[in-house]
Amino acid sequence: MTMRPFFSAAVHHLASPRGGAMPLFLRRGGTQIFFNQGCRATQFATPRDLLLPTGRKSYHSSVATFSSSADVTNGHFMSYAMLYHDSVAFLLSNQLGIPVFMAEDPKTPVDVAKEFNLSVRGASALMVTLCRMDVVKVVKDSDDSVDEILYGLTASAKTYLSDRKDRACVSPFIDTFQTNFITPDALLESCLKGDEKKDIMSEHLEQDDETVANNARHFMAHMNAQSYCCARALPKALGLESVKKPTTLLDVGGGSAIYTIEAIQSNPNMKGIVFELPAIKVITQEYIDEANLSDRVSVATGDFFKDPLPGCVDYVLFSNIFHDWPDEINMNLIQKAYDSLNPGGKIVISELLLADDVKSSTPAATSMNVIMMPYTKGRQYRPKELLRRLEKVGFTNPKVINLVDDYDLVIGTKS
């Protein structure tokens, strides 16, 4: 059980014509490229087979077609255009706290309407959409009206949506997509020629240390929800649980240290180093102290654009780093990782990858690729692109393994 349906339901919307954007602090300074609608909309695209009509009972299955082939309809284009509204329903439900309200007992739309001062018609519309998304399931059907259906939370929704105090809850991450929207004009601006225009990520990093730290604290708190499942899956994926000798993992740009903490907790032979900006160190240390790992995890400060990475380590981890930056910077990071590793050490790149055959890419990956346009100077990579780059630097036995859901690890070994 993972949070894929909910995490993946937030990215697709961001790449749609009025998709949800990133947190408020990333608003572009001089140019008004976002506007607040006050409506709650997003979702990282659900798996393709859930998004597209199946032909069994789709809304358009009986619509007459004008194609020369009876097997070709316009349904999937219509579906993509309309999915924005599913995102709106999902985000509004999260904002209201419907999953929290339903955590203990099944509810009808009438119950939901009464609790949140909604119309029964409105509550029913939300519940039908949440049911398709596997947030709720039908406990008792009604032949008379969807307004009378009794719904209960699914097991995955109970784990990832119903308790905001639980680290596994993805709701804080979903909250970040509630207010800002990438407009078509903003997306066009980011797609136009002109290397001189600044991306929002770079503008954020150029602020004073206090502002960078405050923004980072806010950002980390929300992004931990996104990283939870990936971080928990990392030790098993890398075989860290069976390490027999002292081993050091370097987490570059590790922020809240969520990956490092999970790795170190998996094995007493593991130690960790989080490499972060000086302005971020205090915040990273707070997370380490909270996990009672200050004796095994340290914070090294520096700027990975300018400074060498700490040396004599056995793993160098880049999690969601490469998609933020252009290729020349990433090649430099790969070289720095190679230089910092002990012989036999491994570089580990965790990313939401496009498919080598781009048509087979997941909706989450293609949507994230579009999201990168206004926010960063980067993009999502294909596996073969990263494998080739590792080989160019000198890494051997490059491979790709699945981490969790749509996230993969690209791994290379230093000879």
Predicted feature residues:
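Short polybasic linear motifs
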Residues: P23, T46-P47, T54
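Conserved Class I S-adenosyl-L-methionine-dependent methyltransferase catalytic core
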Residues: D71-V110, K114-T247
